Design a protein with these regions (language model features):
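Short, basic/aromatic-enriched C-terminal tail that caps enzymatic domains
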Residues: 298-299, 308-336
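Nucleotidyltransferase catalytic core that binds NTPs
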Residues: 39-283, 291, 295, 318, ...
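Extreme N-terminal basic, low-complexity initiation segments
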Residues: 1-9, 15
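Catalytic, metal-anchored helix/loop core of enzyme active sites in primary metabolism
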Residues: 288
């Protein structure tokens, strides 16, 4: 028997109104900034509980000549997500965000059940950074003809899904590609924004966009806490001691970048540096690998590298974390 997940509504949609002191608005392109002129006006984030209403809202924006930026998420928003939204706000007339905990990309039902959810808190954060619309839905609303996840034929995610995360989480990238296609068709964005923290996923999504002919995929740098730990929705599941222990992932990656800048180029030697740092941190390493970011391969590289992406997955207690770092450039946001 395949995976079976009960389909149910997981969020309630309250529509709080936020009073603002406004007069007329000042046009900044097709985006409008309020001015402070003394009259009371109400501005709210549009919250839509299903993909069909979201589709109509986005179609109206495009019909009015507005560019639509899109940030797909599974909720439990943190500074990494908000950085994507801010980038989208800066580059588009309107921005929408999806919040959908996608059962298709979970191998373990317990992991799905454990995934943090707080729609109202997420919506409040989105409103503060200038998002115009947020929507969600159930699996059955996205796939009306099915009642459980294992009835859905998932999309082939392509060769970039092979190895590493694809090997550790069979079916994960098929689930990602399948829901991203649905979300793209709902929103019809000109640009969609993803974080480099999920590096292999970004390759899969770029391939999907090439096959669909849209949207432009904008991959933004990983955002880190002051400790160097990459922001992740799963970080809230860590104890204080585990949170400190988890910093060994980023420490290993930045040690590797220093080795690269000091002239080390051999793939095997670089991987040895990374493994040494991770073993010193005491985490349970699932993989610690290098890949050419421009030419994905299932096999680990050997010999000298011209450019390199270091990728790691490890368990800290019961929490599985991933991280990665481009070695031949310096553009992560946060502590190094």
């Amino acid at each position: 028997m395949g995976k079976q997940f009960l389909i149910k509504d997981e969020v309630s949609f309250n529509q709080p109104q936020r009073p603002m002191i406004l007069g007329t608005s000042v046009s900044t392109g097709n985006r409008h900034a309020p001015t402070h002129c003394g009259s009371l006006f109400t501005m709210t984030l549009v919250r839509l509980p299903d993909p069909e209403r979201a589709r109509r809202w986005c179609a109206e924006q495009r019909a009015d000549g507005r560019s639509v930026g899109f940030v797909p998420t599974m909720g439990a928003l943190h500074e990494g997500h908000l950085a994507l939204v801010r980038r989208a706000v800066a580059e588009n007339d309107v921005v929408c965000v999806s919040i959908f905990v996608n059962p298709l990309q979970f191998n373990d039902p317990k992991d799905l059940a454990r995934y943090p959810r707080d729609f109202d808190a997420d919506a409040a954060q989105l409103e503060r950074v200038g998002c115009e619309m947020v929507f969600s839905g159930t699996l059955q609303q996205f796939f009306p003809k099915v009642k459980q996840a294992d009835q859905i034929v998932t999309r082939d995610p392509g060769p970039c899904a092979e190895g590493l995360e694809g090997a550790s989480r069979p079916g994960h990238f098929g689930g990602v590609a399948t829901i991203c296609e649905r979300l793209f068709r709902v929103v019809g964005p000109g640009r969609a924004y993803f974080g480099e923290k999920d590096f292999q996923q970004s390759l899969v999504v770029k391939q999907l966009a090439r096959e669909l002919g849209f949207p432009e995929i904008v991959v933004c740098p990983t955002v880190r806490e002051p400790s160097g730990l990459a922001y992740s929705s799963r970080n809230v599941l860590l104890t204080d001691a585990e949170r400190q222990q988890a910093t060994c992932l980023s420490k290993a990656l930045f040690a590797l970048r220093r080795a690269w800048h000091n002239g080390k180029r051999d793939a095997i030697e670089l991987r040895t540096v990374m493994l040494h740092e991770l073993e010193h941190g005491g985490v349970q390493v699932e993989y610690a690998e290098l890949r050419d970011p421009h030419a994905w391969t299932v096999e680990s590289p050997t010999g000298p590298m011209l450019r390199a992406q270091a990728l790691v997955a490890a368990r800290v207690g019961k929490v599985r974390l991933i991280d990665n770092l481009r070695l031949d450039r310096d553009d992560d946001v946060g502590a190094q």
